[in-house]
Every structure is written in C-alpha cells, then in structure tokens.
Amino acid sequence: SFCASGNNDDRDQCQIGSNHGFVVHGLWPQYERGFPSDCPSPIRNPPASAMRDAEGVFPDLGLARYEWRKHGTCSGRSPSEYFADVRRARNKVEIPSELEQPRSAQRMSPLDIQRAFIDANRGLRPGMMAVACQRGMLQEVRICLSKDLRDFRPCPEVTRQACRSQQINVPPVR
C-alpha cells in the first residue's frame, strides 16, 4: 500500500515485478507515549559492512539508511547490531498466507487482518498490534515486541492508533 499511497513509483520496491509483499519499514524503541527519533549519534551513515547486514531485510538500502538515522540511532546499538535486530524482529513475525503475496486487490476489515496475523503468530494477541489505514487503504501492520525481540507485548500507545474503518483495500503485490 506504500506504493499505491502517492508518488512512490520510482522507488525500487514499487517497480512492477519487484514482488514485494509486506516489508520492514522500521524498528524503533517505543515509549508508553511516543517514541524517540533522530537521536545524536557519531555514526550518521552506516558503514558498508553494516549495510550488507541490512540487505534482504529492507526493500532497499536507502530505506535502511533512513531507518538507521531516524530510529537506529536511538536504539543504543551499532548499525550492524541494529540491522541484525531488525532481521530478528522480521523473522519473528509470520505473514499470514492469505496476505503474503496477494495477486489481486482485496477488501478486508482491519479486524480480519488482525485475526489473520494472530492466527499465524503464536503468542500474538489483540492489544499487541495495530492495523493502520489511510484513505480506505491498508497502510501498515504495527506489531509490538519485547525489548529482547523474543516475545510479543501489549502496546496501548500503538493500538490506540489502529484503523477504525469497517473495510479497507489491501493492494496486490507489484
């Protein structure tokens, strides 16, 4: 839905045939109210060795660099450790089969999307995730993990921002 939401056709992940379904668009420390971003760091641009750790996790390395600057700098981790954490978090979450590679647009309720993720992920419950939408379209699925990334955890700050629409469009994979 990122690709359908605006002028993003020039992004690698939005090219026809890129075959990206759900992708990581961030991992950040979450406070009970809000989150830190753009923290002071001696490393603004991750070294090439760290960028290799980001390959295959983010849809493109430009997004990986951006996410490091915005959120990774607040993680208390080195760029390589941050990207390894992102990979661990991504590997923790199973994308439901019906949403993994949709070939045609679907209409679903946010609750059905939430249920699909809960069914696919042992230990995930309502209150530990939120389906976000914008202008009637799925925007993202936000899932909260413990600090050590081993368990799902409640996150009222995130769930308060969940989509309230009855039905939303889920775009196909490009």
Name each model-derived stretch.
Residues 1-5, 11:
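N-terminal module-boundary/linker segments of secreted carbohydrate-active enzymes
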